[in-house]
């Protein structure tokens, strides 16, 4: 698991998956362009929807929950990044 800034995410020109793990209300209100929504409490129920062949960027409010989930996914062989500081950074 690696931490990346929003700027590093924006510079990554590869095909990638960006996942917003905040509440649905916050996702609807505002999110990163093209981000998929999976609420953090339900994340592991949707693990089969996440392709291992793409880099995955996760973000939450502060970076704490995305760090925790990213660590789990890293152990399962995903190329996973947690956005440092969360959505507002």
Where on the chain are the PLM-derived regions?
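Flexible, polar/low-complexity N-terminal or interdomain linker segments that lie immediately upstream
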Residues: 1-30, 40
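Short active-site oxyanion
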Residues: 14-17, 33-34, 54-56
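Structural signal for short hydrophobic segments within the conserved structured cores
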Residues: 17, 36-38, 81
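Short, structured coil segments at secondary-structure junctions
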Residues: 31-33, 76
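Short, composition-biased local secondary-structure segments
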Residues: 36-46
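Catalytic cysteine-centered active loop of the rhodanese-like fold, especially the PTP/DSP P-loop
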Residues: 44, 49-89
